[in-house]
Amino acid sequence: MAESMVTDPIYLDETAKANGAKLDLLNATMLGVSASLGVLAKAQTGIFEEMDYNAIKAVVDAGSAPITFPTGTQLVNTYTGKDGKAYDCPWDVVQPDDTAEGESGATVPAMVLQMHYATLYDLQFSAYQAFYVVPDGGLVAGTYNVKMGLNWGNNVKTDAVYQFTLTKAAPAGARLTGFYNAPDVVPANWKVYVYKDQQKSELLETCSVTAGSAGTNLGTFLAKENGDLNGLHPVGYGDNRWWKSAYRQYLNSDAAAGAWWQPQDKWDMKPDQADTLPGFLSGFSDDFKSALSRVKVVTYGNGVTDDGSAVVTYDKIFLPSLQEIYCSPQVSGEGSYWPYWKERTGAKTPQALWQTYPLRITRDLAQRTVGRNVRLRSANRGGGSSAFHVGSSGGVSTWTGIIALRSAPACKITKLA
């Protein structure tokens, strides 16, 4: 079934007036391409007309998107929640004049769309990561210890040693997790959890942690991976790297609940919501899903648990970066700025981090007066566990990977396969 489009840019009333001339030109342009579009989207407030995504892609590929779909235009489709309730889902044209690179290396014209409202459901960027993979042969019942090789927050101190006791053997391939929120939780409240596998199909044991060096040493914790131990940053608060995030898998899947998540490395653990949320794309029509292409997305590492270099992924749906939403990035190169956000905020230069901007508030798809916290894909380069987000009051700051938030994701409309 074809989707719907509204051509009025609603992001600011003033912008609607300023774009009047553009919309007149839009109307004229659409007359010229109506044979291929099959319909005419009239440039009048509140007019919705059915559109064909193949026709939209043809306009983009011809280089006509900046005239036909100026910044702020909305393409409106339908999103159906897991309860079967359907919502009009506007996508803002945030950059009508872009390019996209496919997995083959081909580069084509592209138009960038971003959801105007926040997604319906909260999701962790990343679960707490495992700190130890039980080797072949398993771990026998007994006492084990780990040493701290870093200072972190109030409670992680270099050279401190902590022990825990397994009351039964842990099988090969089991994952040890724990030390959750370590810098902010007193050691007396730390725990170690033994899971059968990365899917957390069975919690085999929960162990108390105490100060002490009894038993077998498993290694020394650093912020990053060290020997047989994962880095304490992603262990304590989740991972902040887009390439391995649960959020990336969720946004790019239409699989049923329980079927869209797979571990991305040996430390990765299933997020809490994976068994109850279907993949994000499951809420859209086949027409919309078939219009999406995997495009090159660049995201930098954090410089703590990795070397901080750029990582390339190919995604149909992706979270925006700081740079794309016209904020001052910690590192340049995660895309180019989208003019929508410059116009929406009225900013003359990219806006500073750690400040609050009410014009950046993203509201809920179902409750359109309610502001939501929305994830970005940019990692906080000062640590291995926090990624940026825009808060429900418009603040631009970070939150740890394990916190479940909404998002306002983006996609690129192109002629790529």
Task: Identify what each model region corresponds to.
Residues M1-L31:
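Short, low-complexity N-terminal tether/leader segments at secretion or assembly junctions of large
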